[in-house]
Structure formats: structure tokens, C-alpha cells
């Protein structure tokens, strides 16, 4: 997709929710998956870059997303919101089920072009964040790391926090790193540039 202008990002809707590949959309539209731990701000990221308030439901209860949620964007692109990981109150068996569902999608979906891996800029990446990044690198899936909640940190400390995140992830310079805030609307254009470069 050469130009951002050809994509009407406001023309977006939730298409379907799927538990396994038999429920995935059956076409060749490119897909960008969004992964991150519970309450990292995935729903806010989706709503902010699409300019919509409640397209993806934000929840005060972590672990709310239990299926792969496919969002149709102008019939040209899809976002796929995968269940948030690292939520302790979900049973081990439930976490294992989610893990299998996520792994099946990430490793077998031909439509997948890249993964937006969301981390919290305020904190060093969790064990699960690092495992997700390593998993994506192992399978040679392009990664866009989006560090959320930048508005919670003084601007002058962003570089320091970015360095902490990158070091913990063993960040590959061929990937993209974006500082993002849905509150201050920071990183929207950079996110679209990185996404459209992959599709």
C-alpha cells in the first residue's frame, strides 16, 4: 500500500472474533497483529490511531480480550487484537489456551505482515514482553515496538526509558521503535508510517 492517503482510517469496524484458524477471515487482506500485556494500552492505541473513541473497548479489567479480534480498516487492511498476556488472575489452563491460540495465528497466518508489540515505556519490559519479542524474532516476523503511556513520564526522561526497554529486549535495530501516548496523541503518524511500510 503505497500511500497513506488511499486508506480511510475512519472507515473501520470490528469484523469478527475468532478462537482458531477455522474462524479467520478467508481472503488475502494484509493484517497487522497487536500484542502486549494486559492493560498496556492496546485498545487505546487502536482507538487513537483510527481516530475512534470506542471501536476497541478499553477495560479496567485486565484480561478482557479472550479471542482474536479482527478489525476491518477501509476494506484494505486489518488489525488483529490478540489477548493480553501476563494477567495473573487468569487460570494456568486458560493462559495456556490463549498462548496456543496466539501462537497458531502468529506462525500460520499468511496474511500477517507485522506485529505491533506494545510495551509500557514507564517500566522495564516484563518476562512475557521479552518472550514475545524473542518469539517474533525467532519466526522472522517484522516487529514494530510501540512504547505506550509516554505522557506519564517527563519528556526529558523518554530517552533513558527507551534505552532501558531496548536493552532488556535486546532490540534489533532493523525493527521500529515508537514512543506513543494516546492522551497526548504522540506517535500516531510514526505508527502509521511503520505499519504502511509493512503492508
Swiss-Prot record:
Ranges of residues in domain EngB-type G: 28-199
Cofactor(s) needed: Mg(2+)
Coiled coil: none
Pfam families tied to this protein: MMR_HSR1 (PF01926)
SUPFAM superfamilies xref list: P-loop containing nucleoside triphosphate hydrolases
PROSITE patterns documented for this protein: G_ENGB
UniProt xrefs under CDD domains: YihA_EngB (cd01876)
Residues annotated to bind Mg(2+): 43, 65
Amino-acid positions noted as binding GTP in the UniProt annotation, renumbered to this chain: 36-43, 63-67, 81-84, 148-151, 180-182
Gene Ontology process terms (BP): division septum assembly
MF-aspect GO terms: GTP binding; metal ion binding
Record's keyword terms, sorted: Cell cycle, Cell division, GTP-binding, Magnesium, Metal-binding, Nucleotide-binding, Septation
A cellular-component GO term for this protein: cytosol
Domain of life: Bacteria
Function comment: Necessary for normal cell division and for the maintenance of normal septation.
Entry's family note: Belongs to the TRAFAC class TrmE-Era-EngA-EngB-Septin-like GTPase superfamily. EngB GTPase family.
Name the record gives this protein: Probable GTP-binding protein EngB
Provenance organism: Streptococcus pyogenes serotype M3 (strain ATCC BAA-595 / MGAS315)
Amino acid at each position: 500500500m503505497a500511500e497513506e492517503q488511499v486508506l480511510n482510517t475512519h472507515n473501520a469496524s470490528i469484523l469478527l472474533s475468532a478462537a482458531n484458524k477455522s474462524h479467520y477471515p478467508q481472503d488475502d487482506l494484509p493484517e497487522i497483529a497487536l500484542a502486549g500485556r494486559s492493560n498496556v494500552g492496546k485498545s487505546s492505541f487502536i482507538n487513537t490511531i483510527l481516530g475512534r473513541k470506542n471501536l476497541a473497548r478499553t477495560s479496567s479489567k485486565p484480561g478482557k480480550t479472550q479471542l482474536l479480534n479482527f478489525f476491518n480498516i477501509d476494506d484494505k487492511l486489518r488489525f488483529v487484537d490478540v489477548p493480553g498476556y501476563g494477567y495473573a488472575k487468569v487460570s494456568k489452563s486458560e493462559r495456556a489456551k490463549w498462548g496456543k491460540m496466539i501462537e497458531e495465528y502468529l506462525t500460520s497466518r499468511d496474511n500477517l505482515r507485522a506485529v505491533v508489540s506494545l510495551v509500557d515505556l514507564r517500566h522495564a519490559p516484563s518476562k512475557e514482553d521479552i518472550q514475545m519479542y524473542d518469539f517474533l524474532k525467532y519466526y522472522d516476523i517484522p516487529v514494530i515496538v510501540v512504547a505506550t503511556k509516554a505522557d506519564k513520564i517527563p519528556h526529558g526522561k523518554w530517552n533513558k526509558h527507551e534505552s532501558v526497554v531496548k536493552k532488556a529486549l535486546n532490540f534489533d535495530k532493523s525493527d521500529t521503535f515508537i514512543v506513543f501516548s494516546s492522551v497526548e496523541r504522540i506517535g500516531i503518524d510514526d505508527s502509521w508510517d511503520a505499519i504502511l511500510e509493512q503492508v
